[in-house]
Amino acid sequence: MNKISESIKRYDFEDKISGKAIYTPDVHPEGMIYAKTLRSKVPRAKILSIQTPTLPEGYFIVDHNDIPEKNVIPVVFDDQPIFATDEVNYIGEPILLVCGSEKSVILEIMDKIIIEYQPIKPIVSIEEAQSCRAPFIFKQQPHFVHYEYQKGNFDECVKRAKRVISDEFRTGYQEQAYLETQSMIGDYDGHTVCVRGSMQCPYYIVESLKVALGWDDSRIRVIQMPTGGAFGGKEEYPSIPGVHVALAAIKSKRPVQLVYERQEDIQCSTKRHPTIIRINSYLDESDDIIARDIEVKSDGGAYAGLSSVVL
C-alpha cells in the first residue's frame, strides 16, 4: 500500500507536458467548416433591424430562427437566451453565427452585417440595481436570490457589546485566464448530434441541447475533450457555444468548429462575481469579537447563470 503523502502522476500528465494532448482546436474532421459569433457592441438595447449581405456559396447564418424549440439556456432561472432576439443585455451577447469554409471570408461577411439598435440605459453596478424601481425582472424586487443564515443568539451579543467596528470590502471581476479558450465542435449524422469540446459539466450541455432541439437523450451525445484549464469558467457557459455548433452542424450537415479568440473569450464569458462585503464586528469589554453581522452583495451580471449557487 502506498503512503498517502506520496505524489502520484495524473493519468494525463505525460501527454500534457509533452505537448501530445489533443485539444478541441487540434481536431479537424473531414469536411469541417468554421463558425464565428456576431455579438452585441452595446450594453443594452432593442434590436430594430439586422441587415445581412448576399452570402457567398457555402456560407450561411445561424440565429434564433434555427432553434426548433426553446431559445433558452436551462441553468437555475432559465433567463439567458441562446441567441438574442429582440433585445441585447450585455456587450458581447451572441446574436448570430456566420459559418463557412474560410475564416477570412467569415470575418468579411461579419463586417458587412449592419445592426440597428435602440439604446436602453444599462444597469452596471450593485448600487444602481438596488435603486431601481419596477418593472423588475424577477418578481417584485431588484435582486433574484436572497439568503439569510444565523447561528447563536445574535441579539443578546449585540446588547452585551461595548463597541462596534464596521468595515466594507469590495472585490472586482476576476477572469479565470484558462490557457485554452472556449472551443467546440459539432457534428450531425442525420439522427444524432455530437458536441465535443472544452468543458467542465457535459450534462449541462446535454440539457441545453434537449431544451433547444426538443430531442431525447438517444439523439444527443456530448464528449468532454482534454480541457486546457477552466477554474469555474467552463461550467455553465459552454452550453452556449455547445448549442451554437450543434445548430450549425444540423443546418449544414457538416462538422462545425467554433473557437473563441482570446479577446472575445474575456469579453463575453462568465467571471468571478464582483461583491460588496460589509462587516459589523461586535466586541466585548476585552475586545473579543462576540458577534458579527455580515452582508454580502454579489453582482450577477446580465443573466442569473450560476450566481445563486456561487453565493
Short names for language-model regions:
Residues M1-Q141, K251, L306:
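Flexible, low-hydrophobicity surface segments
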Residues K3-E6, V105-S125, Y147, I205, ...:
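Gly/Pro-rich active-site capping loops and adjacent beta-alpha segments
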Residues I22, V42-R44, D66-P68, I95, ...:
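Short, glycine-/Ser/Thr-/acidic-enriched flexible segments
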Residues G31-Y34, E57-Y59, T85, G92-I95, ...:
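Short coil/turn connectors at secondary-structure junctions
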Residues T37-V62, L96-E116, M184-M225, G232-S252, ...:
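Alpha-helical support elements that line or immediately flank enzyme active sites
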Residues H64, R219-M225, K253-Q263, I290-E295:
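Beta-strand segments within the central parallel beta-sheet cores of soluble alpha/beta enzyme folds
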Residues P68, S131-L213:
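Helix-loop-helix junctions that connect adjacent transmembrane helices in secondary transporters/permeases
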Residues F77-I106, G233-E285:
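Glycine-rich and small/hydrophobic secondary-structure elements
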